[in-house]
């Protein structure tokens, strides 16, 4: 039975998984600078016998293909591998050795889970119905991210379904967090620069006040829209305001941009000798799962991890560039609990962040169950838009 093979193989590889994760944790590389990590991934894939490997996909991406019995279809899994510009404050044997670089979001765990998935697959290749594509992605933490450049470089070529996971310390180990639709919000960044012969403090204050009226007047009561102004610097003649827009609706997003630009023009007209520049930096689109993709995740989890608690979660107001993949092909993204009440209690992006390493085995087991059942999974996702 394939479930027994998955469990036995992952149990056997688990000490190696811990070694892989801790090596990456000790040698983190921040977004768009992950050359050594990419090389580490490639060399490990070669070591376990995978030959179809593409490197420098997009920039630092690595894509591996494992042949199944029928290569006319394929299923993909994605793991991100970039770190954050944070100093690791943990007192552990595997804390970061690189100043101002830390795996403070669990991407080392994601990568380890997918490497373990690849190892089990290559050793049981004859049982694999269709090809499996392993997408190791750089640059998730910093927009514009690595997903879009990797897609533009054809990482999804001939892919029929894609799945991804994020280990999540707000959920306890032994919990699956799922959503049938919206999971992560779009996160767009903008900046407003004010130059004036009047008082920039007053103009900036009026801009701040009016942005919240956009939220209250122009969004529907059940429609999520958050405009956050995170930084304001002001003197008499100059002011700078930076903010983010978070939403799940592209039409609402267009409306908000228009309203903010119109607000800048209105303030220019109201205060003589004033020039206001609105700069839009963009961000990730909302991550909206395909319902059938989430159902396949739930089925796989029930099959391989019957004791795990499955919890439908509210949409998160964070950005995640896996959104780009499910805009291209059917699939879904899930959260998997990695927290506890002791060392793994800290939020993501915290200098003391850590997680229950057992979650890597659980993530790999879900990926493997989907992969070995890829004929049914791909067929069940047909027609998903």
Q: Predicted segment positions?
A:
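N-terminal hydrophobic/helix-forming segments and targeting peptides
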Residues: 1-22, 28, 70, 123, ...
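Acidic/His- and Gly-rich active-site-bordering loop/insert found
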Residues: 2-103, 108, 112-115, 119-128
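Divalent metal-coordination and catalytic microenvironments
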Residues: 24, 64, 77, 107, ...
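Histidine/acidic-residue-rich, glycine-tolerant segments that coordinate divalent metal ions
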Residues: 62, 84-86, 90-102, 108-112, ...
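Non-cysteine beta-strand/loop elements that form the S-adenosyl-L-methionine
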Residues: 76-78, 87, 190-192, 333-339
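Metal-dependent amide/peptide-bond hydrolase catalytic core
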Residues: 201-385
